[in-house]
């Protein structure tokens, strides 16, 4: 699908994306203009926040992840307290490796205003050709009113964006 927001988006595009994610329960691949959607991604950024949506996206994308040369598990500002605090992504990386995914963990401090700013920067810094993330970790109305990482990425992600929830 093309981006659902922006000057070139049709009036029903956001509704179609949300219907696929919420009603049909299927992943969605958003492909920016000018990018070949038929080329298998070699380098992938996997946005990880330990949420249910991120886990669902990861599981749905396992066949894609297993075929890639590199996957960068990107964790932004992980919790400072909890069982995983000393090793963010420490449970996910071995799980992915058991499924044939070649991955490494990138833990980033939150230094930019929006989570999406970090994710977009990660696509450039790591020269990835796909972003995988969970969609709408907050209520849809909240993202519509106040913005959120999902909506920002739908508008601005420079590489194909695989979303699931």
Model-derived features: positions:
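Structural beta-alpha unit
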Residues: 98-131, 136-142, 159
């Amino acid at each position: 699908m093309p981006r659902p927001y922006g000057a070139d988006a049709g009036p029903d595009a956001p509704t179609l994306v949300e219907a696929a994610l919420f009603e049909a329960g299927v992943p969605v691949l958003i492909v920016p203009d000018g990018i070949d959607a038929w080329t298998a991604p070699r380098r992938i950024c996997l946005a990880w926040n330990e949420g249910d949506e991120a886990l669902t996206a990861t599981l749905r994308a396992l066949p894609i992840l297993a075929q890639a040369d590199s996957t960068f598990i990107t964790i932004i500002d992980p919790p400072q307290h909890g069982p995983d605090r000393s090793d963010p992504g420490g449970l996910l990386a071995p799980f992915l490796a058991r499924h044939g995914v070649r991955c490494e963990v990138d833990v980033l401090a939150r230094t930019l205003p929006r989570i999406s700013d970090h994710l977009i920067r990660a696509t450039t810094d790591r020269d990835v050709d796909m972003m995988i993330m969970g969609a709408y970790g907050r209520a849809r109305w909240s993202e519509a009113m106040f913005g959120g990482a999902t909506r920002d990425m739908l508008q601005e992600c420079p590489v194909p964006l695989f979303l699931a929830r």
